[in-house]
């Protein structure tokens, strides 16, 4: 925010430090001064100060910043004069304001002023505004901008005659403060027409019964006034509004509209509702000075939850404060500092009873008070000292160690780790075949940055597949993986899972299975097996996998993930030209099963013999079924069976596929003769042919 040096000086008794020195002090004790420049023919200096979000509620104003400067420089603060509001009798129809929700509008205050004069502002106020980048328009509009920049409370002025309703009747006029409906239109003071999102705060007027006129939106509350009620040179009566609006609602609306104002930026950080009347009293005091004149004929003040905005009391233990700061601290010095920040302090034995002003929303516990004391004293004045504490080795984080091992294993296999957003959007539902039930289990983001980030991801695979889609033209094969959290609804609760997913573009089921075996072996998991894929809604979605080329990964009956090829439907939707193999593992379950114990098997000193076998089986037959039959028939002398080819296509009967295996025979205590190997191999052939649907090809 831009601050005028001359303007700040008005609220300080005594001379401020030179502009450069003041900037240095603010940098050391409060906020970063991002820029310092001269303005207005070198009569003033402008400080561009980066007010931190946790102090925006009280320091996005010249009086707020002056209060900080007074505390830092040990100077006295002199606040601007206000004027007690006096209501006089007038001829205007009274105003009634209805607020839809006190959560959305904690306080609504306004002054109805009759008989104002619209004209040019005095030179001094025009110069003040222009110094900080605000154009002077007329005395009423300049008043609202000046009060906002001085006090931190945004104001807005309505032309009261432009608010629909009876003008001079006892019935009065009516304004409603409510949430907008989706798509409602409003034209703002700067001639922009907005189609409003649902939930935006708006103010509408209410024409008199029988007038035939519809209700109109006259204000985008907290952000920008409506054009229909704008102040003009012919304005005679004004409604001067100072309200307190819900910070989250204003922030969401300005983000959705991609439109903001200085008032909206202030409201979006939440401010003290008690500021509204203070700002109106200050505005009333300036009306005569700015030539506005007029008389107040009505005060509106809706503040139903005023009790919840009372001052807070915090007990500060002096011994605690000294130990945190690392310096001896007297009660007297602590009291002086806190009082300079507008706190009220009462001394007790070894404690301070501190009453914090309502504007300081950031002061909630004694640690906050210690921080305030520390920064005003100056962190640079606190002597550096080495911490005195026993040096103990950190505890072993088993989860991180196993995760590092998994990452290294995948990188060793040629995979690249990627990091994606934790979101998916509406456009992902169709290509990834989300059903209505799938969508219900997604976690919707309340305030998404865009439609592309409308939901939290329920799987890592979708974004990985989009990575493949965007990079497939650059290379023949892609190997990527991601570690991250997924989110879903299950039985009325939010479930968050830590997952690992890997993709091989131009890869097959068996290639991915080999990767999975390598990872599991590296984690000491030897009891893994693969079962027919039967995805449940809380674990994965069947629609993303290729039916017949996917499997569940199990360890001792515990499901730990899925692997297989991505369905042709998804490939077509994403325009992927090659098949994609995928692996999806639950890291939490996987790490619980991992073991550092590695069993060592002495390799045989005797040579092995290899035989090949080709078997014609029905298309739906699982490879594991055939391998189990061969292992059972061969006994302990069958050291390994590997599938090296699977053929489906021409020259085979319909509904059939050909499986080709290497069978390795080996003994640990002797060299097997050819006759022994042939006998074992024939046993396996016989066992296979016992199944009438299987045929050994010779």
Where are these regions (language model features)?
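Broad gene-expression machinery/nucleic-acid interaction feature
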Residues: 44-48, 92-94, 108-110, 174, ...
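Short beta-strands and strand-coil junctions in structured, solvent-facing domains, enriched
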Residues: 55-57, 227-228, 247-248, 360-362, ...
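A carboxyl-terminal module marker
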Residues: 2-3, 340-349, 493-495, 506, ...
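His/Asp/Glu-rich mid-to-C-terminal helical/loop segments that flank catalytic regions of hydrolases
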Residues: 273-290, 461, 467-478, 678-684
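RNA/tRNA-interacting regions in translation and RNA-turnover enzymes
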Residues: 1-379, 383-399, 404, 506, ...
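Class II aminoacyl-tRNA synthetase-like tRNA-binding/catalytic domains
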Residues: 176-207, 215-231, 381, 388-496, ...
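Glycine-rich, charged/polar anion/phosphate-binding loops
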Residues: 96-99, 186-190, 223-228, 266, ...
């Amino acid at each position: 925010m831009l601050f005028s040096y001359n303007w700040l000086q008005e609220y300080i008794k005594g001379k401020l430090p030179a502009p450069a020195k003041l900037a240095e002090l603010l940098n050391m004790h409060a906020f970063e001064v991002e820029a310092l420049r001269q303005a207005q023919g070198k009569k003033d200096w402008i400080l561009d100060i980066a007010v931190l979000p946790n102090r925006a509620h009280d320091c996005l104003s010249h009086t707020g910043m002056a209060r900080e400067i007074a505390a830092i420089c040990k100077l006295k603060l002199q606040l601007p004069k206000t004027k007690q509001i006096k209501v006089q009798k007038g001829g205007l129809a009274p105003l009634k304001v209805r607020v839809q929700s006190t959560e959305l509008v904690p306080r609504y205050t306004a002054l109805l002023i009759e008989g104002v004069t619209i004209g040019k502002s005095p030179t001094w106020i025009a110069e003040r505004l222009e110094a900080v980048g605000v154009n002077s328009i007329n005395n009423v509009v300049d008043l609202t901008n000046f009060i906002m920049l001085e006090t931190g409370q945004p104001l807005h002025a309505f032309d009261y005659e432009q608010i629909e309703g009876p003008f001079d009747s006892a019935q009065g006029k009516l304004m409603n403060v409510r949430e907008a409906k989706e798509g409602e239109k409003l034209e703002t003071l700067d001639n922009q027409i907005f189609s409003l999102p649902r939930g935006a705060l708006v103010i509408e007027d209410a024409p008199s019964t029988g007038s035939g006129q519809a209700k109109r939106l006259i204000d985008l509350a907290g952000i920008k006034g409506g054009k229909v009620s704008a102040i003009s040179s012919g304005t005679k009566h004004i409604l001067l509004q100072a309200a307190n609006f819900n910070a989250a609602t204003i922030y969401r609306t300005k983000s959705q509209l991609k439109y903001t104002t200085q008032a909206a930026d202030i409201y979006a950080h939440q401010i003290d509702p008690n500021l509204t009347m203070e700002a109106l009293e200050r505005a009333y005091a300036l009306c005569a000075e700015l030539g506005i004149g007029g008389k107040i004929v009505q005060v509106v003040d809706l503040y139903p939850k005023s009790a919840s905005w009372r001052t807070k009391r915090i007990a500060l233990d002096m011994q605690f404060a000294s130990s945190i700061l690392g310096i001896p601290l007297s009660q007297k010095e602590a009291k002086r500092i806190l009082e300079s920040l507008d706190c009220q302090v009462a001394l007790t034995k070894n404690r301070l009873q501190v009453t914090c002003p309502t504007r300081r929303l950031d002061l909630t516990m004694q640690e906050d008070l210690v921080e305030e004391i520390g920064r005003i004293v100056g962190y640079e004045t606190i002597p550096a000292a080495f911490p005195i504490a026993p040096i103990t080795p950190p505890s072993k984080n088993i989860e991180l160690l196993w995760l590092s091992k998994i990452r290294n294993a995948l990188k060793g296999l040629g995979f690249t780790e990627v990091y994606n957003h934790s979101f998916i959007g509406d456009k992902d539902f169709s290509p990834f075949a989300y059903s209505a039930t799938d969508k219900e289990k997604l976690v919707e983001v309340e305030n998404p940055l865009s439609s592309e980030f409308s939901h939290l991801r329920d799987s890592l695979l979708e974004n990985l597949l989009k990575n493949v889609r965007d990079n497939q033209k650059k290379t023949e094969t892609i190997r990527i993986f991601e570690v991250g959290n997924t989110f879903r609804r299950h039985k009325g609760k939010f479930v968050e899972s830590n997952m690992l997913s890997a993709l091989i573009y131009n890869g097959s089921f068996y290639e991915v299975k080999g990767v999975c075996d390598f990872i599991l072996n590296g984690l000491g998991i030897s009891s893994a097996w693969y079962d027919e894929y039967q995805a449940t809604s809380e674990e994965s979605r069947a629609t993303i996998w290729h039916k017949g080329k996917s499997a569940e990964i199990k360890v001792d009956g515990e499901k730990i993930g899925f692997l297989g090829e991505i369905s042709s439907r998804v490939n077509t939707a994403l325009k992927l030209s090659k098949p994609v193999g995928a692996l999806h593992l639950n890291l939490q379950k996987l790490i619980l099963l991992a073991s550092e114990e590695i069993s060592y098997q002495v390799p045989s000193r005797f040579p092995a013999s290899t035989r090949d076998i080709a078997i014609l089986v029905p298309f739906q037959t699982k490879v594991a079924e055939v391998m189990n039959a061969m292992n059972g028939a061969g006994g302990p002398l069958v050291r390994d069976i590997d599938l090296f080819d699977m053929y489906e296509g021409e020259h085979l009967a319909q509904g059939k596929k050909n499986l080709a295996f290497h069978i390795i025979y080996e003994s640990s205590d002797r060299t097997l003769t050819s006759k022994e190997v042939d006998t074992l191999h024939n046993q396996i052939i016989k066992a296979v042919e016992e199944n009438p649907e299987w045929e050994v090809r010779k």
